[in-house]
Amino acid sequence: LLDAAGLAEKEPNITGLGAIFVSSTSIVNYRLVTEKMAEEFCVLGGYIAMDTEVTHLIEKSDHIDVQCHQKIALGSSLKNRDYVAKFLITCSGLIADRVTKMLNIDTEFQIIPYRGEYYRLQSQHNNIVNHLIYPIPDPELPFLGVHLTRMIDGSVTVGPNAVQGWKREGYGKVNIDLRDICDMIMFPGFWRVSAKNLKTGLIETKNSWWKPGYLKLVNKYCPILKVKDLEDYPAGIRAQAVLKDGSLVHDFLFAESPRSLHVCNAPSPAATSAIPIGDYICNKVRDKTLTLVSDAN
């Protein structure tokens, strides 16, 4: 634990009453990690079908039929592509609820998209912090707050916020999708979570469009930054599971059928914990398949 003086010694540009210093904290390039995992998966005999949409899942006694549409290279037309799985694992993110519904799994949640918008500091501020800086988050919300991150390339990013999205894969401020909107307004949990967090939601929306409002969040702990220091940076989409009663799911959420297991909600630190989460899933699938074999015998 650091008091104000200890914080100032480690981070001269950060102000606060105190801080928790975690010496083991670090970052990685998740794109490179993912690419390497994909490479090793393919070496072991795996196959990754790109530009492929799952359209139907049909569970039978001894397998699951996976029906897909795949975009043809150098064209926009689609071709049918089907797979057969003895056991199916899905980590479907923004369409996790729709995938579980394909198998008629009774779930009480829906995925609501929240856009996380970032800025990058101008290069002269690459040394503004020595560590990763996180504010104290709101315990009522599963978001970490706008923080400063020193990236692998030496740059520093600011963010993210959490803005209600109107398209599940809408990375721009004005992206909308009628199907996604209809799904949301027909889901009672959407209205309840919106009512519970109305003030916060309005502030997040305002700050999304008004950069000084966004900057104010950072200035609480890094007062030397100015609006001109914030450069545009790609946004991300958080696939947030919301229950019918309007509760935001703060923890991991899984759903299953006899021959499938679905990761329905994976909050931070899901990427950091990806390998142990994978171990957990493998162990759970191993237990389920052993049960299937035992029942068959």
Q: Where are the regions that the model predicts?
A:
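Flavin-dependent oxidoreductases
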Residues: 57-177
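Conserved active-site and cofactor/substrate-binding residues in soluble primary-metabolism enzymes
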Residues: 28, 32, 91-94, 143, ...
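Active-site catalytic microenvironments for nucleophilic, acid-base chemistry
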Residues: 40, 102, 284, 288
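Generic secondary-structure signature for well-ordered alpha-helical cores
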Residues: 12, 42-46, 59, 105, ...
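Flavin (FAD/FMN) cofactor-binding and adjacent substrate-gating region
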Residues: 1-50, 56-69, 174-193
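Non-transmembrane alpha-helical segments in soluble domains
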Residues: 38, 100, 215-219
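C-terminal catalytic lobe of FAD-dependent flavoproteins
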Residues: 184-295
